[in-house]
Amino acid sequence: MEKYKDKQLSAYERAAALADTLSTEEQAQQLKYDAPAIEKAGLPSYNWWNEGLHGVARAGTATVFPQAIALAAAFDKDMMYRVGEVISTEARAMYNSAAKHGDTDIYKGLTLWAPNINIFRDPRWGRGHETYGEDPYLTSRLGVNFVKGIQGEEEYLRAAACAKHFAVHSGPESLRHEFDARVSEKDMEETYLPAFKALVKEGRVEGVMGAYNRVNGEPSCASEKLMGKLREWGFDGYFVSDCWAIRDFHTTHKITDTAPQSAAMALKAGCDVNCGNTYLHILAALEEGLITKQDIRTACIHALRTRIRLGQLDDNEFDDLPFDIIACDGNKALSLEAAEKSMVLLHNDGILPLDKSRISSIAVIGPNADSRAALLGNYNGTPDRSVTFLEGIQDAFDGRVYYAEGCQLFRDRTQGLALPGDRYAEAVAACEAADVTVVCVGLDATLEGEEGDTGNEFASGDKPDLRLPEVQRVLLQKLKGTGKPLIIVLAAGSSVNTECEGNALINAWYPGQYGGKALAEILFGEVSPSGKLPVTFYKSADMLPDFTDYSMKNRTYRFCDDESNVLYPFGYGLTYSHFECGDVSYKDNTLAVNVTNTGSRSAEDVLQVYIKSENGVKNHSLCAFERVSLFDGESRTISINIPEGAFETVDDNGVRAVISGRYTLYAGFTQPTELSEKLYGGRCVSVEISI
């Protein structure tokens, strides 16, 4: 028996044995994202590029979950695990089916390039909705559970997750191929690295993807400093470049002169797989003496090790996962659950929930009312059925439903031959005819997304400001002017100031294929909203630091100088009931908090714990959270673990330590700030600890 077939050996030993049966040229070929077959071993050709951000993407029909930022708003670790589990199960079933029919093309593999765990430090960044928000602790907890769900706990990986984009990457999109992000050691350790460290050490993530930009002068895909962190953490998976990022070394970053030099720089630093074509020049780099045969062999072993862990050399427990598990009813039910938990009620004057017995007609208006794009975000699959906001309301309400588009998403007319504002009159008429109006505004992935991937002609995927497009602002003012009850539904993946709250404001994000059904359930009170903002919503971008400034000074809730520019704070969100915290105590790393549902209906809310010390971050940091479900009038003591790392502080050299002193733990259903407590209508409780 060939040594690489011996299942008693480790994946590394088997990969090394297989690599040693290949010539140097054959080893080099395995480092491309579209790797050829190794026929002698029965290993088929393989395309490393697949996506699974919130469902298997770009590969046909799949369950489409809410966008990543929406999943983060649920603050639900268990749900993240289950979402990851569904995504990888569907990916494996697709892989089995495609392989059976000889299809090993792009988006058919088992290496899912997700999650995106970059910190959403600036609300203008177009790709922020791919992330889990602005907080490193929240990002870490959700990311670890997502990775564990993706990869499974069986003998072989169900699929291989990939933490991206290592490690400091958040716009501007238009500059990403040439930009150098300058970051202090303190900010690096305190903000940008924790999620990656957690996914490597706790999640055992199989892949890490480097970013396009440089970090402190080094290209992310060939950074000795960053690669050293991975080695320090014990990373033993594969490292892949972002797509065509290595080409940027010589074309836009200008840190090398030729493609062979770029290939050599990345390979020697530890980049195993090249998404792109620069590794076609590896043999030229070898001939020029820029790399050694051992450099090629090492990367080849790492790549083959991942494929062996996926069971591609062996019969495994996933080989029989059937095609019919894709987009099955159970998977789609989880998508609905995620949408229900992720929507955030930002304002409610008492109009919600709507009483069907007291209204006979509803107007549903706006460019996102019947938009499927507003459900899906980016990096999405194709649902076999989706429910728009309009359709969800129509399905749930027996009375008259008026519909008017009102305006286009951002253009000033809906038809080329029409005059500007050609649908405002219809929208106002529908609003006047109805008892209540639900207006669906916001963005979609054509207005915020990835450079080269979106239709945003203004900012290469980034947002130029935090306002709605002008045509939508005009629409809102016209509807508000009728004096009729107005509920605003915002579909967006980032901070947007609607400049009008109406009688109620719901942030629906990009809620996945059943977003319309989830919205209707919330509007009519079948489900109490329970989402919380994983990012700060600002009034204006004018008071924010420069977009290209990667310092955390005056960024995010942890470092903002004051709340004068905050519209809705991180961690904020209302329910149809009201939860309060009472007695609180701390012992042996456990915080015990008595919580009571003082409202008139059962509901679920998110208990949040923040820590503050004189040596810590400027304000306070999230250090624990848990969803709590209570009947009306019910009280319960919630015991929540406080991780030891919560008490660590980071000095200017990026060194972590626990410093003796006094620490304050705050527990509540929002942040411990004046604005947060005012908006939520309740205060946090606190306990002081001496260390």
Please provide the spans of the model-predicted regions:
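Glycoside hydrolase catalytic-domain context in secreted enzymes
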Residues: 1-671, 690-691
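Short beta-strand elements
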Residues: 674-691
